[in-house]
A protein has these predicted regions:
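GST-like domain detector, emphasizing the conserved glutathione-binding G-site
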Residues: 1-128
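Amphipathic alpha-helical packing segments from all-alpha helical-bundle domains
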Residues: 129-148
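Surface-exposed helix-capping loop/turn segments at secondary-structure junctions
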Residues: 80, 145-153
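Short, structured loop/turn "capping" segments at alpha-beta junctions
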Residues: 105-110, 142, 149-150
Length: 153
């Protein structure tokens, strides 16, 4: 099992935490330095054409990509301990919370998104920060509201 990783990647942290909880140790961790643009190198594009990490290669076949999909794969192939509750509603709730983080908040810290805002829309750094803070704030407020219920939070 090979994990393509970068130490500053929140998405990779999600996968590494899941692996740690399950006692899974990858055979190899391959560092893809996003700050140096290594995700754009042809060798990595063959692993993940989206040029994003994490990516996981487990045996034969194509690499797995996107942290939530990788975590579901790990949970299905290594069922104990489970990452998700047993009941369908509980699983859906956890997936919804994870998607707020992965889909609504996390992309705002990804360099390629911030670079796109700067180059395509001519946002200066304070404007990018203001934009990101607005959407982060909305996502965190939603998470706080969802997690306020002590029975399910």
């Amino acid at each position: 099992m090979k994990l393509y990783s970068f130490w500053r990647s929140l998405a990779t942290y999600r996968v590494r935490i899941a692996m740690n909880l399950k006692g899974i140790k990858p055979d190899e961790v391959i560092d893809i330095n996003l700050m140096k643009g290594q995700q754009r190198e042809e060798s990595f594009k063959k692993v993940n054409p989206m040029m994003a990490i994490p990516a996981l290669v487990d045996g034969e076949g194509p690499a797995l990509f996107e942290s939530l999909a990788i975590m579901e794969y790990l949970d299905e192939t290594h069922p104990n301990p489970p990452l998700l509750p047993k009941d369908p509603k509980g699983r859906a709730r956890v997936r919804g919370l994870a998607q707020i983080v992965a889909c609504d908040s996390h992309p705002l810290v990804v360099p390629r998104v911030r670079e796109h805002l700067a180059h395509e829309y001519k946002f200066d750094e304070p404007t990018v920060m203001k934009w990101a803070q607005h959407w982060h704030g909305a996502a965190l407020k939603a998470l706080d509201t969802h997690l306020a219920d002590k029975a399910t939070g």
